[in-house]
Structures are given as C-alpha cells and as structure tokens.
Amino acid sequence: MYKAVSKRVTRSSGSGLKQTNVDNGGEISPTVDRVSEQGKSSEAGSHMPTDANGNGHLHHEIMDHGKGNEEQKPTPQTVKKDSNTNTKFSGSHRELVIGLPCRGQFEIHNRSRASTSSKRLGGGGERNVLFASHKRAQRSKEDAGPSSVVANSTPVGRPKKKNKTMNKGQVREDDEYTRIKKKLRYFLNRINYEQSLIDAYSLEGWKGSSLEKIRPEKELERATKEILRRKLKIRDLFQHLDTLCAEGSLPESLFDTDGEISSEDIFCAKCGSKDLSVDNDIILCDGFCDRGFHQYCLEPPLRKEDIPPDDEGWLCPGCDCKDDSLDLLNDSLGTKFSVSDSWEKIFPEAAAALVGGGQNLDCDLPSDDSDDEEYDPDCLNDNENDEDGSDDNEESENEDGSSDETEFTSASDEMIESFKEGKDIMKDVMALPSDDSEDDDYDPDAPTCDDDKESSNSDCTSDTEDLETSFKGDETNQQAEDTPLEDPGRQTSQLQGDAILESDVGLDDGPAGVSRRRNVERLDYKKLYDEEYDNVPTSSSDDDDWDKTARMGKEDSESEDEGDTVPLKQSSNAEDHTSKKLIRKSKRADKKDTLEMPQEGPGENGGSGEIEKSSSSACKQTDPKTQRLYISFQENQYPDKATKESLAKELQMTVKQVNNWFKHRRWSINSKPLVSEENVEKLKTGKEGECETSVAGSSKQTMETESVAEKPTNTGSRKRRRK
C-alpha cells in the first residue's frame, strides 16, 4: 500500500513542485531558466510569459535574493540586464547564478532544438516535463556542490521517439487479441454481404416495381442460414475472449463490502507473483476482469510515462480488445452491447435457432418430409383416385406391423419390376443398328439427295438460255437439300439413339455438299452471265463476289446517254471482256504486262482501243529506261537500296519511281490467272466463233464512221471504265 501511494505522489510531485516554484520564488527560485526563456522552450513557455510586465516581478525577486552571493566570471560574453527591455542572450551566452540548489535546470539548448521540443510536447508533453523536473530535484538533493553546471545535450523528447518506434514494431506482432479482431471483421463483412442480398429482394422498389421480381428462394434461404452461422461464430469469439480475460483474475473473496482490496493481496495475473520493484509496479485494470499486471509482464511493457492520470482509467489488453470488438459490432449491426456484458448476451437468437431446430444449418436443402413414413412420390396419383373406404382401410392396415411389411415388399417389387422394364427398353434401343440397314420404311442414305445434287448440277450446266430459270432451279435445289436434313428428325423422334446417329450423319454430309455445289455454281453462273449478256458492256474486274446485276443496270443507263458511241464501246468492251476472261487479270495487271509482252486477243482486227494499247506497249518496250529496268529485274527481283539508287542515278529517275516500278512488276507477275488450262481451252472453243463475228461486225461499223469521232469515243470509254 505504501508503494502504491508513493507512486501516485511521484506522479503528482511534479505539479506540486511547479506550484511552489511559482508561489515561493524567493526560496526555490531555480525554476527560472533564462537560457530556456531565450530559446522559448516548453517549460518557460508554459509557466512564465516572455514580456517584461508579466515576468519582471519574479525576476527582481530572484535577483534581490541572490544579491550577496552573486558572482560574475570575467568573460567577455557576459551581458548586463536592462530593466526597461527584455533580457536577450545569444546562442552561447549564459548568466550564472551561484548559491542555487539545482544544477540541472541551467541547460543550454539551441533555438532549433527548443522549437522542436516545444512541438513534440504539444498535447501530452506536459507530463514528461513534470517527470523530468522531479528527477532533477532528486538529483540536486544528492549532489553536494551546486556551483558546477553541466549542459545536457539530449532533449527531453528524444528517447520518447525511440520508444515509439519500438512500440510500433511490437504492435505489428499478430497476437491472440489481434487475431480475434481480424476474425470479427471478416465475419461482419460476410454478414453484411449476405444481408445486402436479402435486402435487394425484400424491398418493394419504386411504386412496387420490385414486387414482380423473381425471388431466388433457395439463395435467400442460404443467405439467412449463412448469417446465423456467422453470428454463432461471433458468439464463440466473445466466449473465447471472456475465457482469456478470466485467467488470473482476483477472486471475489479478497474484496471487502466496499469493493476495495488490500495491496498485499494483489498479484500479477500473468506471472502470479506479488513482488514489487521501483520500475515494475503492479497496475490494476479498470475494466470488468479485475486483474493486475506487472509493468514488464505486459506486451508491450508499460512505462511510467504511459500510465494515465488518476481521473483516467487503464484497460488491460483483453478488456481493450473486447471494448474495440464491441464498438465494431455495434457500429456494423446497430446493436447496443457494453463491455460488462458477458458472451451469453451476444446473439441469443442464433443460439436459440440452433437449439430449436437449426441443427441442419450446414445443409443446403431442408428435409421437411423426413418424419413422414407414408410418403411415396410414385403413388400420388393412385392415392388421389382411391375412394374414402379404401383410405380408411389403409389407415387401419398401417397400424398393424404385418400390413407395413407387405406394403413395403410390394412397393419394392414394383420398383424392381419398373427398373427391369426400363433396363430392357434401354437394351433394345442400344441394340438397334447404327445405319438402319433393316429399316425398310426409311433410309438416310437414300439416292434422293444425290439425285437432287446431280439435278442441281445438271440445271446449272445445261440451262444456258434463261438466267431466271437457273435462279429458280437454285432455290428448288436448296429446298430439296434442306429436306433430308429435316426429315430424319421427324421420322426418328420416337427413338433417341437413332435420332442421335442420324443427326450426326446429316451434320457430316451437309457442309461437304454445300461447298461442292457452290464451287460448281460459281463457274456455271459466270458462263451463263457471259452467254446471256454478251452484247452489253460489262466491267472486267476479277472479283467473283461483285454484284453484276447492279453494275449492269448502271452501265445500261450510261449507254443510253451515249447513244452515238455505243458501237465503238461494244466492240472494244467485247474484245476486253473476251481477252480478260481467258487470262483472268485486272486492269492494273494488264497495264503492267504490256511492258513485257503485247496483249493477246482473239481478234487481230480490233478497234482503235486495241491499236492504242499495242502502240503504247511497243513504245514502252523500245524505251531504253524500261529495257534497263527489265534487265535489272531479271537479275534480281528484290534489289537492295544501293542498286535502286544507282539505277535512279543512271536513268535520271527518283528512287521512289524505281521502287514503284519494281513493286508493280512483281505484282503483275504474281497475279497470274487462276483459271485452269482446260477451262481456258473450253471457253476458247465455245466462243471463238461468236467473238470473232461480233468483233468483225463492230470493226466494220467503226470503219464506216468518221475518223474524227475516234478520239472522243475512246476518251468516253475510258471515263466510263474509271467510274
């Protein structure tokens, strides 16, 4: 008891010394520190104002008291006091007062250190100053010679910073109480997550719009069970926390009627000893656990500076953890639990649900019919059709043990028979042949499909007189091809195994037939188009997907506007069409091929356009620049940069022009006709006579016209082609 009282006196002695220093300035005047006043430290700033009016009386009193014993050393740094102005000292100047009892109060601090210490002592730094002043007073009593002045270079707040870093390192350790807090946060997050799902389907929404929303009943039921499970786990956490706080608590028999206990009966809850020392005192917890701890038995150890004052309470780590956990629980779920509440008061409804019938919380689907022994899902229809008398008879039979046994055996026999029947049906289905060789009514490999395909091919190849009939034939072929894919599904819907096999056969045969038919039709449609629209000007592009009907209508409108030049255009376009039908080239490829060889055509007596092309190709061949480029191209189709620069310098051309010439030349060689030789010969033999006659007739018509009209017709045809 004496040591506890002495501890409290120690904590309050600083304030008492401070009061005596202010009131009895003549007796204990060492609290006035002029050097600290100059540096604006925390002690002088908190106890003494710096202006002359507030500080003059106390300063004069101190100077009068020490007038006889005051001695000044003959140093050139001594500064005299001016009564009218404040005392000012430089950073290293100081004034010594002889005969004072305390030596540790005359400390020299720089302005920077004084300012930083005053900042550190903001808020809770006053207690540290009080403890430091008390320690200085004790040291002054022990020392005999007060005249020596020792300057302390370490500020008061410097070791406190180091201890803070140590405390931070110890807080990071994951102890038992920290793990409890983490688990509690996790459980609360899961509860809020599941509750948000329930709230999303429980709210009515704007004007009841959410009432029509489909509610996932099973999911909502699962969320409710999950919330109950989490609450039970939170209850278990607080139970574990209460058991930890009950370890080493003081028994109730040691307390008197007033709730007080003797200091001799207090022991440490961790080590169990009653030993006390100066720096390792036992501190009682002000929470609900009624335990005491040594300062160094706590983790982290509790220092004297961290002990709260008398009007503030101190909580042990267990009570502190429970307080924080309950605050977190109340803020999250809106409950009102206190630290004094035991774990039985936390979520009693969850425990009641567990005891009252919630043992199957871990099951996803509850079994409501678990106690119903008469339930049989296969006999519902039979029971509904029974008469009242039969129901009474069944009830009377259920009372006897023999009737139960007979019903059980009959039900089991029926189930076995039904299982055997289903097994026989499956065997019959699996025993069916995969290709339906024995089925006389249906044959998936019937020759109708092949006949339809052959008829489609024959229609595409034989019908060359009318284009519309070919389109109609194509539509009928597509319908005929789709029917064998649909019929197997209709005819074999009764047998599952056959339907699967036939659908697989249909899928295997379908894409191959479609791709084969499209390849043939593309060539046949081209031939039909050429035969049907032979005398109409067409485009000479190589794109097979080009919409030829739209192109034909556009060119018909242009041909009507240019009525005078139609014969010339027809003749030149007929020659271009037949020639490019044979070699399958584009306009750009034809222009580049003229550099290598003249364009071949079926008729030698062509129009003016053919004469111009041959003349331009001849000029290009005789051009020395072109010949030089041909020679270099034959040597290397991909020349390097140095070769291109040398050619450009030699032929007086730019490097870009030479590069473009090589690029176009390579493109013209690579874009060779994709038509086979057989198709070319077939087209030659089939149309050579017609083309020659048409070209000859057109040439005769053009020769009869005036020679002046040749140039505008050629330019007009070129403009039309560019469009």
From Swiss-Prot:
Residues 11-23, 695-705 have a biased composition (Polar residues). Keywords: DNA-binding, Homeobox, Metal-binding, Nucleus, Transcription, Transcription regulation, Zinc, Zinc-finger. The keyword Repressor does not apply. A zinc finger (PHD-type) spans 265-322. GO terms for biological process: positive regulation of DNA-templated transcription. Residues 1-94, 135-173, 357-628, 680-723 are annotated as: Disordered. Residues 614-673 bind DNA. InterPro entries: HD, Homeodomain-like_sf, PRHA-like_PHD-finger, Zinc_finger_PHD-type_CS, Znf_FYVE_PHD, Znf_PHD, Znf_PHD-finger, Znf_RING/FYVE/PHD. It comes from the Eukaryota. SMART domains: HOX, PHD. Primarily detected in root tissue. The keyword DNA-binding applies. One of its GO terms (molecular function) is sequence-specific DNA binding. Residues 58-83, 417-427, 518-530, 547-556, 680-690 have a biased composition (Basic and acidic residues). Its main location: nucleus. Residues 1-10, 580-589 have a biased composition (Basic residues). Binds only to large DNA fragments. Recognizes a DNA fragment carrying 8 copies of box7 motif of the light-induced cab-E promoter of Nicotiana plumbaginifolia. Also recognizes the box7m1 motif. Belongs to the PHD-associated homeobox family. PANTHER family: HOMEOBOX PROTEIN HAT3.1 (PTHR12628:SF13), POLYCOMB-LIKE TRANSCRIPTION FACTOR (PTHR12628). This is Homeobox protein HAT3.1. It comes from Arabidopsis thaliana. The gene is HAT3.1.
